Amino acid sequence: ILNDNETIGVVYDSKEHTSPRKQEIIRLWDTLKAVCRFSKETGISLQTAYNTGMKIMDGTERLSDDQGDVIISNYPNHGKRFYTEMKRFNRIHDIRLEQEKIEYLWEVVWETVRLELYRNLPSRLHSISYYQDIGNAMRYCQFGRDNTHIVLSVTPDKQCRQFDENWFKQITTSSNYDEVTELAKGYWSGKMTPNRIIEVLVTGKYEFLRKV
C-alpha cells in the first residue's frame, strides 16, 4: 500500500520511514492503552470502552449519577479513573478519539501481546507488511483500503515472517480486550485461519514499482 508520504521509485527504510497511520498510533499509544485497560477491567467490549472515551473527551459523558453514562455508573471505581485519564489526555496532550480510528486499538493489542510473548518477532509498528501475490493484496483492498502497489524489491535486515492477517477480521463490535488478545495470540503464533490472508512483516529497505 502506497501511503500519502511515499512515492513510486523511491527506496525507503522501514526503520527510518514510518507511515502517518503508524505515527498516529504511537502518538495515541497511552490513551489507547487506557481504553484497553478499561475494557479488561470491566469486561465490556473494546468498542464500548472506546466510544465512552470519545464521549468523555467531547464533554457528553459526565461523572455525576444523574447525567453520567451507564457505563461509568456501572463501574464507579474503574469508571472514575478512566474518566480522569481521558480528561487528562484531552486537556494536557490535546488528544481526541475519533470513530474512524477505532481500528488503532487492534494494533495496540497486537503490539502488547507481541511485547509480552513474542519479542523476537517484528513489530507491526516498526516494519512494513506486504503480500507475495496479487490475490491477497486485492483481498486486503476489499476491507476498505485501495491504492495497491507492487513492491519492486525488499531488502530485509532480518528474516521475513509470514502471518495471517485474517485474524484481524475475527474482531467484532462485541469483542472485549481478553477476546481480542486471544486473536492476537493466534496471529503471532503463526496459526492460519480457513480464509487466510498471508502478509509478510519485514524490517529493511523497500521500493514501490507501479500501481496495480
Roles of regions detected by a PLM:
Residues 102-125:
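Short linear interaction motifs
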Residues 2-103, 124-126, 135-148, 155-212:
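Conserved NAD+-utilizing ADP-ribose enzyme module
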